[in-house]
C-alpha cells in the first residue's frame, strides 16, 4: 500500500495526523539535515502502522510517497 506524507520537520513534537485514508501529516522533532528527519519519519510510521515502511519517492522533499509492506 502507498500513502502520501507531508512531513513537518523541526516542529518540536512527534505526531501523526490522518488527513484521509491515503494522506498523513507527520510532525517531526528532527531537523531536515543529514537524513535525520527521514530516519525519524520511518521510525514513527513503523510504530504507527505496525508494518515495515520505506520511502518510495521524495527523499529530499517534505512531501513523500511511502510504501507499507
Segments and roles (model prediction):
Residues 1-34, 39-43, 47, 51-69:
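Contiguous, often N-terminal, cationic amphipathic patches that form binding interfaces
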Amino acid at each position: 500500500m502507498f500513502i502520501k506524507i507531508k512531513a513537518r520537520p523541526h516542529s518540536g513534537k512527534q505526531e501523526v495526523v490522518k488527513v484521509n485514508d491515503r494522506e498523513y501529516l507527520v510532525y517531526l522533532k528532527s531537523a531536515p539535515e543529514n537524513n535525520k528527519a527521514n530516519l525519524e519519519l520511518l521510525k514513527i510510521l513503523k510504530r504507527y502502522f505496525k508494518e515495515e515502511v520505506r520511502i518510495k519517492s521524495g527523499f529530499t522533499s517534505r512531501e513523500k510517497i511511502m510504501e507499507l509492506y
